[in-house]
Amino acid sequence: LQADKLAARSAIQGIEFSQGQLRARLQDQKMVLEQFSLKGAGAQGGEVSAQGQVVWNALNAESTSLHDVQMDLHITARGLRVSNRADRRLTVSGQVEGRMDKGQMQLTGQLSADQAQFNLPDDTTPTLGEDVVIRKTAQAPATAKATGRTLMGTPDVRVRLDLGPDFQVQGHGLMTRLAGQVTLVSSASSQGQPRLTGEVRTEGGRFKAYGQQLQIEQGLLRFNGPFDNPQLDIVALRPNLPQRVGVTVAGTALAPRIRLYADPDM
């Protein structure tokens, strides 16, 4: 089996893979994936490649159960530009192992961000007024709950991500570089929903509050649950003052608490 010029694109997500190649061979009840590769966007978009095999262990030739399928897959990313959107750029390297046995899919590995730039949406983005109501023309048919469950069951995922040396974030008054490691976990116990564990720190940067540009002195984001709602522990101070004056940010990303700060008390 062989295929060339494979591609995958999504303008909404900023995904643009091309120049793909596939080389595989069938051997009895086994398919050996000798080569699979895709290039990332642009001249320096990097590459993702995979090798492995899929074995069909069914005794009955008419069986279609995934419990009869065993898969081992090794995936390598080398400077792969995963997203190329203007407000979301991400390049990663690392390795991921995929395995399926008795209908259960497992993904483990470690990735490192070579470069990232995330621009958070501005608070002034236009939205519909509260008096605007959108009514559906027809009720969509009932479907399974929106979890990570698939025909292969709920995937068991554990992938560690190192934010690397150049992970930039800007928006909501914040401009900083993030550093640290987090682990992406998804399993049946979380109903397939992705969760993050780990701690991320800010490295310098600025935070705008009450019309003032403040320097971030301390910034910690602690993840232990949903990826979009870490615990916040941030101290940002006005520069070039004899007294430490600024704000503290506590709570969570979805419910932050911003308070004035002074040391010593004013």
Predicted regions and their residues:
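Strand-loop-strand
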Residues: 4-266
